[in-house]
UniProtKB/Swiss-Prot annotation:
Name of the protein this chain belongs to: tRNA uridine 5-carboxymethylaminomethyl modification enzyme MnmG
Binding locations of NAD(+): 273-287
Keyword Ligase on entry: no
NCBIfam families: mnmG_gidA
Superkingdom as given in the UniProt entry: Bacteria
Recorded GO MF terms: flavin adenine dinucleotide binding
Protein species of origin: Psychromonas ingrahamii (strain DSM 17664 / CCUG 51855 / 37)
GO CC terms in record: cytosol
Length: 629
């Protein structure tokens, strides 16, 4: 049957990509339909119960700056918050929240069910309607045909999903859910390159069977950070600790003895797994010199006894899982509530996508999330928001948009995928961004919220809060530039107590904050120098802007220089091993890819700004011109 209502945007899948895509399109005023196989699992955390981390926390803040859902849900569900790399520079500091699965899922669902212009329908999709290389709708398992101007595919690990525990396997999208077979077959009929990837999850353990007195306790930060720019600590539920244990030689021996029963090492699994989240089998074999690996013992929520042992993802047989788990300190009597497993699934080559995440070959069809070869909730959510937004822009006959590599980690993510593709599950790290000093967590709103407002993603409440914060930051920086302090002033002794060497001459407050040993809070708290900004995020941004302005300015100059040189052609026969100063990794990647110009070279993952500068000098010095074959 044909459904009576025509939609602007249809989103297939209700995971982290799908929920952000549907919400983004609806915020823009698009008549949006979210199709999911089960409304109860909207926003479900299928693997680890955590949001954020190095590189990932930056994505969460960017999603929030564009009006997305993830940061707000993490604030409402976070049962432990930590700032990672807190002792390092602001570019690599990252927020991470241990989350209550049920609270997170409930927060996402509440947002979706109260979002204007969004309808949710529970039904599995089996077919796409494609006419003259343009998508025009979808068909569900019941034969219901929904028509739409655009369709966003966010089907995660469900396409031809195959779950492995030991040498036994069965069809499934994740534990407890069936795989999407019909849609997978239909997509393989389209002119799209496809492949197989693999991911995995550890066994879950009943906390009542763990001896926590034998484990190292890990408390969260106090005061707790917040993820959302509109967030408040009062939204956080009760905070609880995590714990740490370790594998040992006995653990490793059990695993090594049973590798012939592993689907990964017996050749049953052909898909490539995530490099930066390896299974315990992989860790034992790849790092044979290590006799121990750290395992984080993470609660799954406030109302459950289940524990997520982060670091022992596995697809070994169930009996082997029990044996190696019980070999670890504190886990001698562990009761496993769910076995760990690996899952293989179809993904589609993201090089077949435009930077808007629309297919190059089928108009109006967008891809986001693990279907593009990524791994992680945050990577999926960022893609989902951009895909949903661009679907909305297409409906309005407006030009698509994707942030540049110098604007957002989301831009780095999409550029890496659409330019280079991936042969293994792609995870975001701060090291993937050339301009990470510009792409900090604290300034995600400064970078993106104004654009989000222009695109229709940002509502009045967020825009007002952002505008007030920006005004207070600018006003405070100007005040700090204009207010002078003198070596003989009344509060000089208090000021000198903050300094390594006493003041010798007068200085502005801005000049004092530039000193490495002085921070904004302690200086402005001195009588006569305040008041301190009440907005904690604004105060943090004031200090970072002042302390790092010189570095930021130099990086912006570097960006402008590189942009001017993007079209500089590179000789097709150039042997990059002849160029002194390039690392072996950079040389190998350039010789393998043979970029046509500096712009393409700069977008190869791992090619640093320093390497690009060396290339430019070499080209100029040798007056090289690209030879055409």
């Amino acid at each position: 049957m044909n459904y009576h209502e025509h939609f602007d945007v249809i989103v297939i899948g209700g995971g982290h990509a799908g929920t952000e895509a549907a919400a983004a399109a609806a915020r823009m005023g698009m008549n949006t339909l979210l199709l999911t196989h089960n409304i109860e699992t909207l926003g479900q955390m299928s693997c680890n119960p955590a949001i954020g981390g190095i590189g990932k926390g930056h994505l969460v803040r960017e999603i929030d700056a564009l009006g997305g859902l993830m940061a707000n849900a993490a604030d409402k569900a976070g049962i432990q918050f930590r700032i990672l790399n807190g002792s390092k520079g602001p570019a690599v500091r990252a927020t991470r929240a241990q989350a209550d699965r049920l609270l997170y899922k409930a927060a996402i669902r509440e947002k979706l069910e109260n979002q204007e212009n969004l309808k949710i329908f529970q039904q599995e999709v089996e077919d796409l309607v494609v006419e003259n290389d343009r998508v025009s709708g979808v068909v569900t398992k019941m034969g219901i045909k929904f028509s739409a101007k655009t369709v966003v595919l966010t089907v995660g690990t469900f396409l031809n999903g195959q779950i492995h525990v030991g040498l036994k396997n069965h069809s499934g999208g994740r534990a407890g859910d069936s795989a999407s077979i019909g849609l997978a077959q239909r997509l393989r009929e389209l002119p799209l390159r496809t492949g197989r990837l693999k991911t995995g999850t550890p066994a879950r353990i009943d906390s009542r069977s763990i001896d926590f007195s034998a484990l190292e306790v890990q408390h969260g930060d106090n005061p707790t950070p917040v993820f959302s720019f509109l967030g408040d600590r009062s939204e956080h539920p009760r905070q609880i600790p995590c714990y740490i244990t370790h594998t040992n030689e006995k653990t490793h021996d059990i695993i090594r003895r049973n590798l012939d029963r592993s689907p990964m090492y017996s050749g049953v699994i052909e898909g490539v797994g995530p490099r930066y989240c390896p299974s315990i089998e992989d860790k034992v074999m790849r790092f044979a010199d290590k006799n121990s690996h750290q395992i984080f013992v993470e609660p799954e929520g406030l109302t459950t006894n289940e524990i997520y042992p982060n670091g022992i993802s596995t697809s070994l047989p169930f009996d082997v899982q029990i044996d190696f788990i019980r070999s670890m300190k504190g886990f001698e009597n562990a009761f496993v509530t769910r076995p760990g497993y690996a899952i293989e699934y179809d993904y589609f080559d993201p090089r077949d996508l435009k930077s808007t995440l629309e297919s190059k070959y089928i108009d109006g069809l967008f891809f986001a999330g693990q279907i593009n070869g990524t791994t992680g909730y945050e990577e999926a959510a960022a893609q989902g928001l951009l895909a949903g937004m661009n679907a909305g822009l297409m409906v309005q006959d407006k030009e698509g948009w994707c942030p540049g590599r110098d604007q957002a980690y989301a831009g780095v993510l999409v550029d890496d995928l659409s330019t280079l593709g991936t042969k293994e599950p792609y995870r975001m790290f701060t090291s993937r961004a050339e301009y990470r000093l510009l792409l900090r967590e604290d300034n995600a709103d400064t970078r993106l919220t104004e654009k989000g407002r222009e695109l229709g993603l940002v509502d009045d409440i967020r825009w007002k809060a952002f505008s007030m914060k920006q005004e207070s930051v600018e006003t405070e920086i100007q005040r700090l530039k204009n207010q002078w302090i003198h070596p003989k002033s009344e509060n000089a002794s208090q000021i000198n107590a903050l300094l390594k060497t006493p003041m010798q001459r007068e200085s502005t407050l801005e000049g004092m904050i530039r000193r490495p040993e002085v921070n904004y809070q302690s200086l402005i708290s001195i009588e006569g120098l305040g008041p301190v900004l009440e907005n904690v995020q604004a105060a943090e941004q004031v200090e970072i802007i002042i302390k790092y302005q010189g570095y930021v300015d130099r990086q912006r100059e570097e960006i402008e220089k590189l942009k001017r040189n993007e079209d500089t052609l590179l000789p097709i026969h150039l042997d990059y091993s002849d160029i002194k100063g390039l690392s072996n990794e950079v040389t190998a990647k350039l010789n393998d890819t043979k970029p046509e110009n500096i712009g393409q070279a700069s977008r190869i993952s791992g090619i640093t700004p320093a390497a690009i500068s060396i290339l430019l000098i070499y080209i100029k010095k040798n007056a090289l011109r690209r030879k055409v074959l």
